[in-house]
């Protein structure tokens, strides 16, 4: 589903795709915004700023140019909407996990295969306008986002912690590994991720438990 060069001829293009467990899409980006909705299954989306867990009836909004890779953790069916960036001024301005209402999912399903040359004042045009209105008010689900630390030493720790999630990690462990004070760890971690270490660890464990 890479479609790196896809540029919608209309405000919106919808693609439906089936993935099998273990499939991956390497790092890539798009010239338009993208909304990936999981109809059923489970995928992990990784960007330079974090990891995002996407399960059934949830989605991820990726802004234009956001580099991302996909890891399919369970047989998954997705709907992917490619949105022309200039079609609305008030679309979400950052990549984030979002809740998907039954209405939006039904509208997107109806829009699969719509001819890019549809006319105004037609059923197709009205469906597209309704979808664009729904995209303006997507509800973020921050608990499914795990921000990526920016400093290399913390990024290396992320891998170590991920490999031993059952360990009762504490600030003291991180301070000892980095040979700095707990206070410094707490401050630097919050500066890099916007979260306390405890909240970040809770989200990471939640993501791996899904």
Region annotations inferred by a language model:
Residues 25, 40-46, 59-60, 68:
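Short beta-strand segments in beta-sandwich/barrel cores
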Residues 168-173, 178-180, 187, 191-210:
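Terminal helix-turn-helix DNA-binding modules in bacterial transcription factors
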Residues 49-64:
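Short acidic-glycine-tyrosine-enriched beta hairpin
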Residues 97-163:
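An amphipathic alpha-helical interaction segment
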Residues 31, 47-49, 74-76:
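A generic beta-sheet turn/junction motif
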Residues 65-95:
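Ligand-binding loop in jelly-roll beta-barrel domains
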Residues 1-43, 52:
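Generic protein-terminus/edge-of-domain signal
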